[in-house]
């Protein structure tokens, strides 16, 4: 095949990935025009709809998109990939790699990363609610007589969206890209039409209008910044979803279609307001002629459902990562596609999200009310991403500290400005994502600290495995036929389940395997590096299986690899799995306060069973109980 053909194939693949990325990565930021400008001129802000104010706000929107999306995320942050993977937890793992595990900065970076992940969930409960609701509210423009149905229709759409998650979205997901391409083209065309009617709006490209607006209104302009940030919701997704599509397709989509379409639509809305300030009632839907209003409502609703789907899938992926990294208790994870590894479904997360989202929709009643709650989670994550990226630039890339200070300084001024403006909205609704994030942060840190204490207690009371096996082989117990697998969290200590088995049954299987799963700080582990097998003699094997934080441990696959390496055969239904069922007992020993220990014990008790998490046949499991005082 010629170089020209290879180049053509690569180009086709790049374009295909870019279209797919448009359907997943850009849904949230792509549906922001539904409510962003309307919220910026909310009556609560008291900004007059004068030409200078309109030009000033549009200029702010334009430069926010250019500086934060086009430069910060696309050019800089997306360089900080963890073996191709992005997102706040992946960035945290990358930033921790060169640091001393016991240093204070390590603890600070870990806490920042976890808090950033928690704030994502605060965002994840608002995005579907405000997106779908703002789209359905287009009925108030298209068919005012149906305005009383906005809330019921929103609720039905959201319930249906979460109901289908169990069955996966691989099939309909193929349509997401083309639909979102149609969406971006549509909003661009609507914008161009009105820009042509009021070309004066193009002058908002000049940052003079943004600075003039800020200096003229000062305090009110700072409040408006809290609404301007709504145009950036979803910017973090460019980085978080990088592992699915790669940096090049996302950059191509951002620069060629997404950013130009967004800018054209916002400028079109600004032009409409210059022509008719009363259009602030709903500037997005009033861009369309009356005959196109209803089709636009339908397209908007589909686009917001796609945007919501991306956030929901992101919540599943983030939960899976957090479980593997040890910040969240084990949960049942189902794979909804045999072909796409990333297509997963986490039932607990799904139904909790739906419950909270429905409460939000019913409680806030309109997208206008909900807009006050939106933004604070986004800006908090933006600040955290900037700080973690700075650590990576200095510690991992070894960039000049002065250069990093200059780059990060500019980004932090912007991020902290937006974050501070959103703090002003805490009373109006900003408390919601902050409260959700704070609660989750407490639970995740409690779980992480509790697991650390459990490991310390277990290690202190544990028996080293190597000398124990030597003694066991020197004075062997009665051997019985079959295979026994002891799952253990520490491959240097004797599994408690083995001690109990020897104590009560006084037998050892002919083939005994000690299996440990280890999660590394990279997203994926190469297949040939995954499983190591140590032959301890006389049918005893120590198996270590390493997985990345984006992968789910698979006992069956590990056994197949052990069989391949050692020339064995395994029959899963003829194999016994021995597990230690730990019962955590809160005490006044040093570690955590007693009330936090009780919270940890409750989380430990309600974690998914190892049989569910590791997909082990329940009828092949022997559980032996043990108490651990913390």
Curated annotation (Swiss-Prot):
TM region(s), chain numbering: 17-37, 51-71, 105-125, 144-164, 175-195, 218-238, 255-275, 283-303, 344-364, 374-394, 402-422, 428-448
Membrane topology field: Multi-pass membrane protein
Record-level Gene Ontology MF annotations: potassium ion transmembrane transporter activity; symporter activity
Entry superkingdom: Bacteria
Gene Ontology, cellular component aspect: plasma membrane
Cellular localisation: Cell inner membrane
Catalytic activity: K(+)(in) + H(+)(in) = K(+)(out) + H(+)(out)
Name of one Pfam family that matches: K_trans_C
UniProt entry keywords in alphabetical sequence: Cell inner membrane, Cell membrane, Ion transport, Membrane, Potassium, Potassium transport, Symport, Transmembrane, Transmembrane helix, Transport
Family classification: Belongs to the HAK/KUP transporter (TC 2.A.72) family.
Role, per record: Transport of potassium into the cell. Likely operates as a K(+):H(+) symporter.
Protein name: Probable potassium transport system protein Kup
Recorded name of the encoding gene: kup
């Amino acid at each position: 095949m010629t170089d020209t053909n290879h180049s053509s194939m690569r180009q086709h693949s790049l374009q295909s990935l870019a279209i797919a990325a448009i359907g997943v990565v850009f849904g949230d930021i792509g549906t922001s025009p539904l409510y962003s400008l309307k919220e910026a001129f909310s009556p609560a802000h008291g900004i007059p709809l004068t030409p200078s104010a309109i030009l000033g706000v549009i200029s702010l929107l334009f430069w926010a998109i250019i500086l934060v999306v086009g430069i910060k995320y696309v050019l800089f942050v997306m360089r900080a990939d963890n073996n191709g993977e992005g997102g706040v937890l992946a960035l945290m793992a990358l930033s921790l790699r060169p640091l001393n595990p016991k240093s204070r900065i390590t603890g600070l970076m870990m806490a920042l990363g976890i808090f950033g992940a928690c704030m994502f969930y605060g965002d994840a409960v608002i995005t579907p609610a405000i997106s779908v609701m703002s789209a359905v509210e287009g009925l108030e423009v298209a068919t005012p007589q149906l305005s009383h149905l906005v809330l019921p229709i929103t609720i039905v759409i959201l319930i249906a969206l979460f109901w289908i998650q169990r069955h996966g979205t691989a099939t309909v997901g193929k349509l997401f890209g083309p639909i979102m391409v149609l969406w971006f083209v549509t909003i661009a065309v609507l914008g161009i039409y009105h820009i042509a009617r009021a070309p004066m709006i193009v002058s908002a490209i000049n940052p003079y209008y943004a600075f003039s607006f800020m200096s003229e209104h000062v305090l009110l302009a700072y409040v408006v910044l809290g609404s301007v940030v709504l145009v950036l919701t979803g910017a973090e997704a460019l980085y978080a979803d990088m592992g699915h599509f790669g940096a090049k397709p996302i950059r191509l989509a951002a620069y060629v279609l997404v950013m130009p379409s967004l800018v054209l639509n916002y400028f079109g809305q600004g032009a409409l307001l210059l022509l008719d300030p009363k259009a602030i009632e709903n500037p997005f839907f009033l861009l369309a002629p009356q005959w196109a209003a209803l089709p636009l409502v339908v397209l908007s609703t589909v686009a917001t459902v796609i945007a919501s789907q991306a956030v929901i899938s992101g919540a599943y992926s983030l939960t899976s990562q957090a479980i593997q990294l040890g910040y969240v208790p084990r949960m049942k994870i189902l794979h909804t596609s045999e072909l796409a590894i990333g297509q997963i479904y986490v039932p607990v997360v799904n139904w909790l999200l739906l419950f909270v989202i429905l409460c939000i929709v019913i409680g806030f009643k309109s997208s206008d009310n909900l807009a006050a709650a939106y933004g604070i989670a986004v800006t908090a994550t933006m600040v955290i991403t900037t700080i973690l990226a700075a650590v990576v630039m200095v510690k991992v890339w070894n960039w000049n500290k002065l250069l990093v200070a200059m780059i990060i300084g500019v980004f932090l001024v912007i991020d902290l400005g937006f974050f501070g403006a959103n703090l002003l909205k805490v009373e109006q609704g900003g408390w919601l994502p902050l409260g959700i994030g704070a609660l989750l942060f407490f639970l995740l840190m409690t779980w992480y600290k509790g697991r650390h204490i459990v490991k310390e207690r277990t290690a202190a009371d544990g028996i080293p495995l190597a000398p124990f096996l030597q003694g066991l082989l020197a004075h062997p117990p009665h051997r019985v036929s079959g295979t026994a697998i002891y799952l253990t969290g520490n491959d240097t200590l004797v599994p408690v389940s083995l001690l109990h088995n020897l104590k009560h049954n006084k037998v050892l299987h002919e083939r005994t395997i000690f299996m440990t799963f280890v999660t590394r700080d990279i997203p994926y582990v190469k297949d040939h590096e995954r499983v190591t097998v140590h032959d301890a003699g006389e049918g005893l094997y120590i198996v270590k299986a390493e997985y990345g934080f984006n992968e789910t441990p698979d006992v069956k696959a590990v056994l197949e690899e052990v069989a391949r390496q050692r020339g064995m055969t395994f029959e899963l239904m003829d194999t016994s799995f021995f597990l230690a069922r730990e019962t955590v007992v809160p005490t006044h020993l040093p570690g955590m306060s007693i009330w936090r220990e009780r919270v940890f014990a409750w989380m430990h008790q309600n974690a998914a069973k190892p049989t569910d998490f590791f997909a082990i046949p329940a009828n092949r499991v022997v559980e032996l109980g043990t108490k651990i005082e913390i």
